[in-house]
Swiss-Prot record:
GO MF terms, alphabetically ordered: acetylcholine receptor inhibitor activity; ion channel regulator activity; toxin activity
Family assignment from sequence similarity: Belongs to the three-finger toxin family. Long-chain subfamily. Type II alpha-neurotoxin sub-subfamily.
Gene3D superfamilies, sorted: CD59
Organism taxonomic ancestry: Eukaryota, Metazoa, Chordata, Craniata, Vertebrata
Protein name according to UniProt: Alpha-elapitoxin-Al2a
CC terms in the record's Gene Ontology section: extracellular region
Source organism of the structure: Austrelaps labialis
Amino acid sequence: MKTLLLTLVVVTIVCLDLGDSLRCYMGPKTPRTCPPGENLCFTKTWCDPRCSLLGKLVKLGCAATCPIPKSYEDVTCCSTDNCNRFPKWERSRPRPRGLLSSIMDHP
């Protein structure tokens, strides 16, 4: 009887511990379980010299505290599973220009 009770206690502790693990996106479609002590998900975005052509750079991940943004960065943090989805950009991207598009533009 004591063995059964001890087994139930161990299983309960393990299950409760797993329930506290936060899941965050680490890439556009890759959620992972955060390490112990990291209870926040974050999304960090910033521009580089190619930002006008390719859009902002994005870093997703887990953190113990919300990262402090540098002057050129935007950072958001949240604390529920998979709450840091890859951003959907509202800005339209320029149309690629090449031989085929030039022919299509001038029939």
